C-alpha cells in the first residue's frame, strides 16, 4: 500500500477496519439471538480486500 493514498481508498480502508471486530458480548445475550460470532471477520494476511 502506497504512502500517498487517495481519499476514496482511505475511506474504504477505514470502513473495513471498523467492520473487522468481534460481536459485542451484550448482543449475544439478547433473547432469541442466533448470531454467535462475526462471520465476516477478515484477517489482514489471509484474505486481501482487493483494492
From Swiss-Prot:
One Gene Ontology cellular component: preribosome
GO BP: translation
GO MF entry, a single one: structural constituent of ribosome
Keyword Ribosomal protein: yes
Stretches for region Disordered: 1-21
InterPro entries per UniProt: Ribosomal_eL39 (IPR000077), Ribosomal_eL39_CS (IPR020083), Ribosomal_eL39_dom_sf (IPR023626)
Top-rank taxon, per record: Eukaryota
Keyword Ubl conjugation carried by entry: no
Keywords (A to Z) from UniProt: Ribonucleoprotein, Ribosomal protein
Biased composition annotated in UniProt, kind: Basic residues: 1-15
Pfam families reported in the protein's UniProt record: Ribosomal_L39 (PF00832)
Annotated family: Belongs to the eukaryotic ribosomal protein eL39 family.
Record note on quaternary structure: Interacts with YIH1.
Protein's recorded name: Large ribosomal subunit protein eL39
Amino acid at each position: 500500500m502506497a504512502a500517498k493514498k487517495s481519499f476514496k481508498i482511505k475511506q474504504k480502508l477505514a470502513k473495513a477496519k471498523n467492520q473487522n471486530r468481534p460481536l459485542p458480548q451484550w448482543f449475544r445475550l439478547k433473547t432469541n439471538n442466533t448470531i454467535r460470532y462475526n462471520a465476516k471477520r477478515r484477517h489482514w494476511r489471509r484474505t486481501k480486500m482487493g483494492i
